[in-house]
Amino acid sequence: MDVTIQHPWFKRALGPFYHNRLFDQFFGEGLFEYDLLPFQSLFRTVLDSGISEVRSDRDQFLILLDHFSPEDLTVKVLDDFVEIHGKHNERQDDHGYISREFHRRYRLPSNVDKSALSCSLSADGMLTFCGPKVQSGMDASHSERAIPVSREEKASSAPNS
């Protein structure tokens, strides 16, 4: 199959609807023909893409990530940031060896209680990082601290937005 190279300007016209598997959690697993067709990606869901979701409402701050196991993840809070590091060890597949690693950093809102942060992983691999919000006058200390990832026995029930 011949593949033409598109100038980035043409992809911009589709904006957030243009999904590229090269930049999601499936990186390193190979591309399918439909990944090279821009309009095919319009029909894929966000949950299928491995893209993280950040929610912040009046009561809590929430980060949702998927496709992980607890052994792959390290979660820590450093000052006003949550750092999530994941590493899949090298394994062999039909085409050679695959090794994946990622590092994501999210800024915490200033009114999140850093001493009450929690992190859990559902049975279907959905990581949920949650922190309650406090009144604006209260401020937690600024230091580095690891957040343990607890494992849930049931699948996630995170609603789609």
UniProtKB/Swiss-Prot annotation:
User: What processing steps or modifications follow its translation?
Assistant: Undergoes age-dependent proteolytical cleavage at the C-terminus.
Q: Where, per the database record, does this protein carry N-acetylmethionine?
A: M1
- N6-acetyllysine occurs at which residues? K87
Q: Which residues carry this modification: Deamidated asparagine?
A: N89, N111
Q: Where does Zn(2+) 1 bind?
A: H88, E90
Q: Using the record's annotation, list all stretches that form the sHSP domain.
A: 41-150
Q: Which PROSITE patterns match?
A: SHSP
Q: Name one GO cellular component term.
A: cytoplasm
* Protein family membership: Belongs to the small heat shock protein (HSP20) family.
The protein in question is named: Alpha-crystallin A chain
> What is the gene called?
CRYAA
